[in-house]
């Protein structure tokens, strides 16, 4: 029997990217004919070299859409440029792409800070889908972004660009791409077609109107909740005001259950820096921070918050610069979850097509430590889920993973307790697998396994309770008094939710 799942993401500093327990390690092939088969409902670990394509294989029927997300995970300290990133496509036997775009991409953008980034491609079925609609073999193709100058330009060309300098960041392609392989997490999900006669089956248009006004962020006491380091270790959140410490270079993952008919909003706030005005050190919450005077530094795209839907397709991102004073970044207004949203031309609407767990990934640029010291900063998340749940579409089959596109009472409880998927609070949790074994193993084996399940449940609950208790007694660092803005300090500037620059080209779902 597999080991009992760990309660990842307890209070404390998150470690490296955490892959889900039982994740199979596979090697990407250099040819499509050798591609390892990927199955819907499962996650895989792989690697991606600096150059070259890697192939994987899907066997799909004609009654399910498939969504393949690829999360690229550079090692901490890796040099990345604006255009560096990962791209993924699903192709048929003739090399044709199954999505309107040539490939789906995710890039590091102007933050130029290494972190997990995710791109998602799909093969869709339905009355209006003409390509890749037949049952058969399809291929997943993954590579680093071909438009990345740091990966494809000759060295002398890069040096010529570097000599010209840049403003605000390292510049487009100004740093040489790391030669190391990147880790990959590949997640495959499937969505069945609708039952004949389902009301949503005849819908071909997105909702004509919805409240697009900017939601009012929730207020109230800030409750501590440390984030996870990956999709599988993302900590559950319900609506409210949540706080954590975030260090330069870290990415914190959270997940929020959003049901059909409900609307999600989120704002991330970064607290002020408390380094002293002499470039020395200052105490902050019992720790010593070292850096330059508050207001004398400036980091473009210092805080990046990305929202992903249940199949890990990016919905929206928001980012803000940082000059030592408190800043915030908010997602654009999003529509209520509806099956018909998939027919909308705007990605921010089209990706809000599923009920289930939505993921928030919050990253603090590695450049912040250079300007404002190496200690953590205070992060505040204001999350709200508006509206009453509505009945979802009637699928002609079961999604994979199971319960992927709905919100259960167990999900709501997991969000309240801050549980991760490994603790049994999400689709694909280990408890469902044990129950399947009990059902298939007969009475004798079932009694033994139910006893183990009881111990498992008790341990998971105690771990979750311990994590919450630890958070509850955690003291929040007092923000030091302002030392005054140095002469000539940069004026307040925020790049929040303006979308003058996205972290990757426009996607089309």
Where are these regions (language model features)?
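Noncatalytic modules at the cell exterior or secretory-pathway interfaces
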Residues: 64-66, 124-152, 262-264, 349-367
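Non-catalytic extracellular/lumenal accessory regions of secreted precursors
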Residues: 8-54, 76, 98-112, 151-156, ...
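Extracellular and analogous surface-interaction loops
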Residues: 48-50, 54-66, 127-134, 244-248, ...
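Extended, solvent-exposed segments with strong compositional bias
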Residues: 104-126, 232-235, 241, 321-352
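Hydrophobic single-pass membrane-targeting/anchoring helices
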Residues: 417-472, 501, 506
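Cytoplasmic C-terminal tails of single-pass
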Residues: 462-509
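Membrane-proximal extracellular "stem/stalk" segments
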Residues: 253-434
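Edge beta-strands of jelly-roll/beta-sandwich modules across compartments, strongly enriched
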Residues: 148-153, 171-188, 355-356, 367-385
């Amino acid at each position: 029997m597999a080991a009992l799942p760990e309660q990842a993401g307890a209070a404390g500093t998150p470690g490296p990217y955490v892959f889900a327990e039982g994740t199979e390690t596979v090697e990407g092939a250099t040819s499509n004919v050798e591609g390892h088969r990927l199955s819907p409902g499962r996650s895989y670990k792989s690697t991606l070299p600096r150059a070259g394509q890697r192939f994987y294989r899907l066997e799909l029927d004609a009654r399910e859409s498939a969504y393949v997300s690829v999360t690229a995970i550079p090692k901490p300290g890796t040099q990345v440029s604006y255009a560096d990133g990962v791209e993924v496509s699903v192709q048929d036997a003739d090399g044709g792409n199954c999505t309107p775009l040539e490939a789906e991409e995710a890039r590091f953008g102007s933050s130029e800070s290494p972190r997990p980034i995710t791109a998602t491609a799909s093969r869709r079925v339905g009355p209006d889908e003409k390509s890749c609609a037949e049952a058969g073999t399809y291929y997943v193709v993954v590579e680093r972004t071909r438009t990345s100058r740091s990966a494809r330009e000759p060295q002398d060309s890069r040096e010529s660009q570097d000599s010209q300098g840049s403003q605000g960041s390292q510049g487009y392609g100004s740093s040489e791409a790391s030669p190391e392989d990147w880790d990959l997490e590949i997640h495959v999900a499937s969505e069945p077609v609708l039952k004949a006669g389902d009301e949503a089956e005849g819908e071909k248009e997105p909702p004509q109107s919805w409240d697009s006004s900017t939601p009012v962020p929730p207020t109230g006491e800030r409750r501590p909740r440390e984030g996870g380091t990956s999709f599988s270790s993302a900590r559950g959140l319900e609506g409210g005001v949540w706080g954590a410490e975030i260090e330069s270079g870290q990415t914190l993952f959270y997940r929020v259950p959003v049901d059909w008919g409900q609307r999600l909003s989120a704002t991330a706030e970064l607290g002020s820096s408390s380094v002293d005005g002499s470039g020395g050190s200052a105490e902050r919450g019992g720790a010593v921070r070292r850096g330059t005077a508050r207001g004398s530094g400036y980091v473009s795209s210092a805080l990046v918050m990305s929202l992903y839907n249940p199949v890990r397709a990016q919905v929206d991102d928001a980012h803000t610069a940082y000059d030592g004073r408190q800043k915030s970044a908010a997602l654009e207004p999003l529509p209520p979850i509806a099956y018909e949203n998939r027919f909308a031309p705007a990605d921010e609407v089209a990706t809000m097509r599923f009920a289930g767990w939505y993921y928030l990934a919050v990253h603090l640029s590695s450049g912040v430590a250079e300007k404002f010291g190496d200690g953590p900063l205070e992060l505040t998340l204001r999350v709200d889920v508006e509206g009453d749940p509505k009945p979802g579409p009637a699928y002609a089959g079961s999604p994979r993973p199971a319960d992927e596109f709905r919100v259960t009472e167990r999900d709501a409880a997991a969000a309240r307790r801050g549980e991760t998927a490994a603790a049994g609070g999400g689709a694909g949790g280990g408890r469902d697998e044990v129950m399947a074994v009990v059902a298939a193993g007969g009475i004798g084996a079932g009694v033994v396994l139910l006893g183990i399940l009881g111990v498992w449940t008790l341990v998971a609950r105690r771990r979750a309770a311990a994590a919450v208790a630890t958070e509850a007694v955690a003291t929040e660092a007092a923000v030091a008094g302002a030392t005054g803005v140095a002469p000539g300090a940069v004026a307040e500037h925020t790049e929040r939710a303006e979308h003058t620059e996205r972290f990757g080209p426009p996607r089309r779902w």
